[in-house]
């Protein structure tokens, strides 16, 4: 059992002068991961709320104070199961008051493939007005990989689709430095790492009505098992054309699951015709 953070929030309100009580609503919540055999559990922001109020007539359950505790349901729950041949899991995150619904899904079949999917849906614009947006990333990694000749293999394919979403070049550049780029290119353990992956994607691809994204991805390897891998993606924004070419080059020995030596290079190139800019 590992705790990721502790949230303590306070939103005081005052009475309206008509005898209504002023209150101090406290919120205590935490995010934690737990492992029980083959089952992994991730729970986000579960805890309790405490409403501390001061009735104008002094008729509280603690004299002049009224204390009302309550349960705060989690904002997200994830489950992951490793049952040998078949591995899978999912994560769901809901914020109805903000119109945000996010989820991740993973499915692995030993000796065949691993499928990961991430979806972000909003029904409100950032200003609170009604508006729909969607961001989906789907990746598939093959096991064993497809042989391409000369020691090269096709390890995986994937894609990104965004409706009413845009890409922020500066955030994409930051993702290269912070390694958040791996939240886009063939992310691993999408259920266990769902809160961080979703947060990264929301920052890089915010809502913008009338803007669309499309991005094919591929993962190429060399060696068997792959000693060197190149994860490459091209993200295209329309109609305000902006193109991002991003990649992760890795060399691991003897393999990624038990790496004694790991070298990694993240890179990004941006083509912005409107700004007449090409950067790498």
Which residues does each predicted region cover?
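Extended assembly/interaction regions that build large supramolecular complexes
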Residues: 1-280
């Amino acid at each position: 059992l590992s705790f990721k953070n502790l949230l303590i929030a306070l939103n005081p309100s005052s009475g309206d002068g008509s005898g209504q009580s002023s209150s101090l609503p406290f919120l205590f919540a935490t995010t934690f991961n737990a492992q029980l055999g083959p089952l992994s559990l991730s729970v986000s922001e579960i805890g309790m709320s405490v409403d501390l109020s001061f009735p104008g007539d002094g008729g509280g359950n603690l004299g002049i104070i009224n204390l009302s505790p309550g349960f705060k349901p989690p904002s997200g729950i994830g489950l992951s199961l490793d049952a040998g041949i078949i591995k899978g899991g999912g994560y769901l995150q809901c914020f109805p008051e903000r119109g945000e619904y996010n989820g991740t899904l993973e499915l692995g079949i030993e000796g065949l493939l691993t499928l990961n999917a991430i979806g972000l849906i909003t029904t409100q614009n950032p200003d609170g007005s009604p508006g729909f947006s969607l961001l989906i990333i789907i990746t598939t990694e093959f096991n064993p990989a497809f042989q391409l000749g000369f020691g090269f293999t096709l390890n995986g394919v994937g894609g990104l689709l965004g409706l009413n979403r845009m890409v922020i070049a500066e955030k994409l550049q930051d993702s290269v430095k912070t390694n958040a780029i791996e939240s886009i290119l063939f992310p691993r353990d999408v259920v266990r790492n769902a809160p961080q992956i979703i947060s990264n994607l929301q920052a890089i691809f915010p809502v913008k009505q009338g803007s669309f994204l499309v991005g094919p991805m591929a993962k190429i390897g060399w060696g068997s098992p792959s000693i060197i891998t190149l994860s490459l993606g091209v993200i295209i924004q329309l109609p305000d054309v902006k193109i991002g070419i991003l990649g992760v080059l890795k060399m691991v020995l003897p393999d990624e699951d038990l790496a004694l030596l790991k070298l990694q290079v993240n890179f990004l190139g941006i083509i912005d015709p409107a700004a007449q800019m090409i950067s790498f």
